[in-house]
Amino acid sequence: MIDPHRFSIGPAEANIAILQWGESGKPPALLAHGTGFVAAVWDEVARELASTYTVYALDRRGHGASHKPGAYHFLDYADDICRVVDTLDLRDIYGIGHSAGATDLLLAAKLLPGRFARLFVMEPTIMDPRASRSGGLSEESLARVQGTLRRRAEFDSPDVVFERYRAAPAFADWTETSLRAYVRHGFAPLDDGRIRLCCTPKIEAAILLPIYEAMEQVYIGDARGNPFASLTKLDCPVRVTTAAKSGPIYKEMARRAVSLIPGVTTWVFENAGHCVAQEMPEHVVEAVLEFGK
């Protein structure tokens, strides 16, 4: 069994926590999780890939043991990927990402031309800037963001969290290994013995705001502008995947990605939901290795 090595890069106020499976010297694979999760939820996928690749996965900013600076635009996350790539001097990278983490990799690949060998992106968060809309978020999405702020953040113990999440529809199909990894690494101990979400409701709400804006085609970015137009200039092979049981918005954003990215290929995971890597890790490993041939 290949146990991951945990380390971090950067100063304490801007650190990025990283897991590594397997010894150095093999072609690198870089994994980026979706919103709310942590690097460790890739464990079942990463262990299998480590026989072929040196596998790295990061806690994205606002999550796990990484920094929580308050800035959560898409380009902030892409810049973090670039920091990891440059610090570790990674080349010919196989980027593997889920949801907003997949977006990080797509945008970073444009910022670092020639560094990524290929990208395998599962239901990335994408807007099509050619069809952007004016105006802000819908009342429905604003209500979802507000609802995130009311999410329970503190629990008596990891076992309490596991049992509560195991019964929740969002985690019902996760493997036990993936869910336990999330509970172990997605929460931090408090002085009174209880535990608290690392990605607190306040942080998650801030992260979700630009994501919902991208979903609704109203994202405009910050002073750096809207980065999504750059996807038309990617210079490496990209496979965009969807999951048959996922929600309509994820399939719509995948269609946007396909329309923007040159030479893209597609894949469908049957009988799986949005978190396919945590539901059916063996199917993800098979598909990732097939695209890597």
What are these model-derived regions, one by one?
Residues 76-93:
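Conserved acidic catalytic loop of the alpha/beta-hydrolase fold
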Residues 269-281:
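Catalytic histidine-centered segment of alpha/beta-hydrolase-like enzymes
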Residues 48, 91-137:
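Conserved hydrolase catalytic core segment
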Residues 177, 187-259, 265-268:
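Conserved serine/cysteine hydrolase catalytic core
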Residues 32-34, 98, 242:
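The conserved beta1-alpha1 loop
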Residues 17-67:
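Conserved HGGG/HGGXW glycine-rich cap/lid loop of the alpha/beta-hydrolase fold
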Residues 129-199, 218-219:
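Helix-rich cap/lid subdomain of alpha/beta-hydrolase
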Residues 1-31, 51-53, 90-91, 126, ...:
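Alpha/beta-hydrolase fold catalytic core
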